[in-house]
UniProtKB/Swiss-Prot annotation:
Name of the molecule in the record: Large ribosomal subunit protein bL9
Natural source organism: Rhodopseudomonas palustris (strain TIE-1)
Record keywords, A-Z: Ribonucleoprotein, Ribosomal protein, RNA-binding, rRNA-binding
Domain of life: Bacteria
Entry-linked Pfam families: Ribosomal_L9_C (PF03948), Ribosomal_L9_N (PF01281)
GO biological process, alphabetically ordered: translation
Disulfide bonds: none
GO molecular function, one term: rRNA binding
Amino acid sequence: MEVILLERVAKLGQMGELVRVKDGFARNFLLPRGKALRATAANREKYEHMKADLEARNIAAKAEATKVAEKIDGQNVVVIRQASEGGQLFGSVSVRDIIASFDGQGVKIDRSQVLLDAPIKTIGKHSIQVAVHPEVEVAVSVTVARSAEEAERINRGEDISTRREDEDAAAEALAAAGEFFDPDAQFGEEQPTEE
C-alpha cells in the first residue's frame, strides 16, 4: 500500500514522502495513529492543503522537544535492583523502570520514546537513546546498582567487584573453622570414643 507520511517516521521516510509499506503496517500502525494517509488523488490534494499547517506543528513540536532534550541530555538516572555477587540482576530493568526514574526527576517521557533494544540484566552504567521527537534524539545513562552507595561508586568509575574481599573473608572463615575440626580425620568413619 502506498501512503503519504504526515510526519517523519524512523527507518521509513520524511514528512510528505510517498512510500510503499505493507498493508498491515499501514492499517494497524500508520493510519490509526495519524502518521500517514492513503495515497489517493483526494488525499494528495488534502495533503497539499494541510502541508503548511503540518510543517508549522512539526516545527513547534520540535522546538518543545529540543527543550526537553536539553534538560535530559547526558543525564544519569539510578535504578536500584537486587543482584547476584557476579553482577547479574534478579530480573531486569525495562523501559517502564527507566520512565519511572525520569518521572522521579520531574521529566515526562513516553514509553515509545525510550529506545532500548533489550532489557538491562547486569549491574553497571548503560547508555541508552531517548527519541523525544522523530528528529531529536539524546543519549542518557542508566546506572543499575544494588544500593545508592554502589551507584555512587559506579558513577565515580570505581571497580565494584568484591571478589577480592570475599576471598579474604572466606580464607579467614576457613582458618577459624580449622580450630574446631581435626584436619586428619577420615570422613565416613566414626572415630572411637574413649570411655
